[in-house]
Amino acid sequence: MPQVLMGNTRLHAPLEDGIPLIENDENSSQNEVDLYDYVSMSSYGGDNDFLISSAGGNITPENRPSFSAHVVLFAISALVIKPVCCFIFLNHYVITGSYDFAVAGGVCTVLYYMRLALTAWFMFRNIQSDMLPLNVWQQFVIGCMALGRTVAFMVVSYTTLFIRSELFFSMLAPNAGREYITPIIAHKLMPLISVRSAVCLVIISTAVYAADAICDTIGFTLPRMWMCILMRSSSVKRS
């Protein structure tokens, strides 16, 4: 009589009345072990493991991980642009005693580095727990930090540049080009700097820092908002 193995039982072919006979067979456990060994060993194809290796996969160069320009721009922004702008703001504070840009730039920069550290900590904990790098509330907190620092710096910059207008008066003064001051770090090649040049550097640094902050905020929030819109629209279509 033909037999079929199912678990620890042996299923006989149906009889004439259509009712199969099932009998226990303790010796069938050895057959199960042999079957498991066969399945495990069949996953290996010579030197390639088809279950855990992508050696046999045909991945095009466009889909392979690459060192993108975004990484370079991020390094320039975090390690060059922000420190240089803060240095110019500090130099302006030492020269004029006006601390608006120095405080705003310093606080926003410290908040930026805190946001990077918090993001890295969130990602480390989540990946360690086998979860997505950032969940919803973590993305909300990081997005609020990015948006808050940008708005704060923009408000301080607008108030200082266009409402008080002290910088423009200092730059357009008749003697501004002939008055020289000592920069915060004096050098043999540049022992003195004119007031007009110092004010121009502050205005340029303010514009660069504001543009960098806006791009940083857009780069974090816009892709996530767009993905949320796409997911919601796809769920509405399915329903």
Swiss-Prot record:
GO biological process terms, semicolon-separated: viral life cycle
Protein's UniProt name: Protein UL20 homolog
Function: Plays an essential role in egress of virus particles from the nucleus, cytoplasmic envelopment and virus-induced cell fusion. Forms a functional protein complex with gK and this interaction is absolutely essential for their coordinate intracellular transport, gK glycosylation, expression on host cell surface, and function. Together, they modulate gB-mediated virus-induced cell fusion and virion egress and therefore actively participate in these processes.
Topological category with respect to the lipid bilayer: Multi-pass membrane protein
One Gene Ontology term, aspect cellular component: host cell Golgi membrane
Subunit structure comment from the entry: Interacts with gK (via N-terminus); this interaction plays a role in the coordinate transport of UL20 and gK to the trans-Golgi network (TGN), and is required for their cell surface expression. Interacts with gB.
UniProt keyword list: Host cell membrane, Host endosome, Host Golgi apparatus, Host membrane, Host nucleus, Membrane, Transmembrane, Transmembrane helix, Virion
Regions that span the bilayer: 73-95, 102-124, 139-161, 198-220
Location of this chain's protein in the cell: Virion; Host cell membrane; Host endosome membrane; Host Golgi apparatus membrane
Family: Belongs to the alphaherpesvirinae UL20 family.
Natural source organism: Equine herpesvirus 1 (strain V592)
